[in-house]
């Protein structure tokens, strides 16, 4: 449980990511001290519900992230507090960072996300926008 301290807690993030990989988990998800979903160890988190992109607000304690900023400047994004028990409400989930770009998520804990269409579409649009810069 961290809130706004990722820059000071990089060793913790790396350690948690390694521990998660040992358990077959690609990216651990961190909750803040209020139990709200904040971010992944090295990623920002987004959800889709009824074709609306939803993200935890920065006040949840995550770092903004380059791809997160790109998405905010390109698409309408609704910010809301997200609790672990809210997972069943969402159609899709995806993670972002500057190395991965956009990575659709098919499962988080016991929750599965049946669709990855929007995440894949955003990934393709990001790829196309970067290709046009070359």
Indicate where each model-derived feature is located.
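Acidic Asp/Glu-based divalent-cation binding sites
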Residues: 8, 27, 44-45
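Short, well-structured alpha-helical patches and their helix-loop capping segments
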Residues: 9-12, 63
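Single conserved hydrophobic/aromatic residue that forms the stacking wall/gate
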Residues: 1-8
């Amino acid at each position: 449980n961290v809130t706004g301290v990722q820059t000071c807690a990089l060793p913790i993030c790396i350690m948690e990511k390694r521990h998660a990989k040992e358990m077959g988990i690609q990216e651990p998800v961190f909750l803040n001290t209020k139990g709200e979903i904040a971010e992944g160890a090295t990623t920002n988190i987004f959800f889709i519900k009824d074709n609306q992109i939803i993200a935890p607000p920065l006040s949840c304690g995550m770092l903004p992230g380059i791809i997160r900023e790109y998405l905010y400047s390109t698409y309408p994004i609704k910010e809301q507090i997200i609790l672990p028990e809210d997972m069943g409400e969402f159609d899709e989930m995806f993670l972002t960072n500057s190395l991965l770009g956009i990575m659709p998520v098919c499962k988080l804990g016991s929750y599965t996300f049946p669709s990855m269409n929007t995440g894949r579409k955003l990934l393709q649009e990001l790829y196309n926008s970067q290709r046009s810069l070359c």
